A protein has these predicted regions:
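Short, low-complexity disordered leader/linker segments with a strong preference
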Residues: 1-78, 393-398
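N-terminal secretory/targeting leader peptides
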Residues: 35, 63-165, 184, 189-398
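A gly/proline- and charged-residue-enriched helix-loop-helix capping module
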Residues: 163-181
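Hydrophobic transmembrane signal anchors and adjacent membrane-proximal interface regions, especially
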Residues: 45-50, 100, 171, 258
Length: 398
């Protein structure tokens, strides 16, 4: 059995290396790169794909004979895949990287191309579109889903950090909770955490926001739990798709917006229409993205293909965060340069106001747990995980 496993995996790797050579020649005609960043990213995706195909082969018993539905069946899957992000920014690139890794690792059994937000359906309709088969799969944040209980699956204001979300999903009961939640809200969709971005900027605004008193009465774009907390803090919250924020700020439809991390916000151009910026992003210390796939499509896949997709999703969480942290450092320097030129003013929310936000948030969560059993189920699981690792985290910090 060991010989068969090694032999079949060698064949798959040889096939992948052939594809890699072809792609490298395409990307670098005449020895010249079309862009150093594109090349580096392509190499990372290919390297990840090689790891995934080996891991998936091992997990699914690659090489065992007579195991129906385990080794690759030879069936191909052409997936219609849309993400919740506009093309050009980091989140879209990460969603695209996921599809490329799956395609490469599958050896061509899976074909999929990342479509930008609203290409086929609006972002808020993506869950339903995956359920009814309009989309085969999608990447989004739980804050974009229609059920108010679900935002916590991706982020929670003054809640878990990236490493805590990663631990909860990978080593805690996060995936189990996600499975149970999806079965309850839409049994025709399977979901996995598949990416994560760094802490966000709190506000881009057309009027200075230096403290909590300044948000009172302002029209501010907000989503999910943060929108409800902002309302309690005195803001006039406006719900809109993230892709509409630039135009809304430009036209004065809103006074301020939270959108994403520095690299994504810079790419979106908010510095062009909003001369004020406020940190820290207490509303979102990170954002975990979810890969949604139609259950019928998922169950039609052989086990090896399923394992490739699951492994790609997990691997992309770490890769996205690492890349986003670097990109955000670079983007933040660009924001600081604008400030030095007198074109932007950056404010930091006072510590006492951050403590106030925490207090209001805790009160809101306690009330929501009483009225929303689904939210309570997720919240209590996350709090139990934080407590289980908290003592050591505190002891190890310096």
């Amino acid at each position: 059995m060991y010989y068969n496993l090694a032999n079949e995996c060698d064949i798959k790797l040889a096939h992948l290396r052939g594809r890699i050579g072809t792609e490298q020649n395409t990307l670098r005609p005449g020895g010249h790169s079309k862009g150093e960043n594109d090349m580096k990213r392509t190499k990372k995706v290919i390297a990840l794909a090689l790891v995934l195909v080996m891991a998936a082969a091992l997990l699914s018993g690659c090489g065992e004979t007579g195991s129906a539905g385990t080794a690759a069946s030879g069936k191909t899957y052409n997936l219609v895949y849309q993400c919740a992000w506009g093309s050009g920014g980091g989140p879209y690139q990460y969603a695209s990287d996921l599809s490329k890794a799956i395609v490469e690792a599958s050896g061509g059994r899976v074909t999929m191309e990342c479509l930008a937000t609203n290409s086929i359906v609006p972002t808020t309709d993506m869950l339903q579109a995956v359920s009814n088969g309009t989309l085969d799969c999608a990447q989004t944040a739980a804050t974009n889903l229609s059920d108010d209980s679900l935002g916590i699956l991706s982020t929670l204001p003054v809640g878990m950090t990236f490493d805590e979300y990663m631990g909860w999903y990978v080593a805690g009961e996060g995936q189990q909770i996600l499975d149970e939640v999806m079965a309850e809200i839409d049994s025709n969709v399977v979901a996995f955490p598949c990416g994560v971005v760094d802490s966000e900027i709190l506000y881009h605004s057309t009027t200075p926001i230096t403290c909590l008193d300044d948000i009172k009465g302002l029209k501010i774009r907000g989503v999910s739990d943060w929108a409800n907390i902002e309302t309690r803090l005195g803001a006039s919250v406006v719900t809109m798709d993230g892709g509409d924020c630039y135009e809304a700020l430009s036209r004065g439809t809103i006074d301020a917006a939270e959108y994403s991390s520095p690299s994504a916000n810079w790419a979106a151009g908010f510095q062009e229409v909003a001369p004020y910026l406020t940190v820290p992003g207490v509303h979102q210390s990170c954002a975990v993205y979810l890969f949604l796939i139609n259950r019928g499509v998922w169950e039609s896949m052989d086990e090896q293909t399923q394992n490739i997709i699951k492994l790609a999703c997990t691997a992309m969480m770490a890769q996205n965060w690492a890349e986003d942290r670097v990109a955000n450092g670079q983007a933040w320097e660009q924001f600081k340069e604008l400030e030095a030129q007198g074109k932007l003013t950056i404010y930091r929310m006072p510590d006492e106001d951050i403590a106030k936000i925490q207090q209001v948030a805790d009160e809101y969560y306690a009330e929501k747990c009483q009225s929303n059993p689904l939210f309570a189920k997720i919240y209590e699981s996350q709090q139990a995980y934080i407590q289980s690792v908290g003592n050591w985290s505190e002891a190890a910090s310096y």
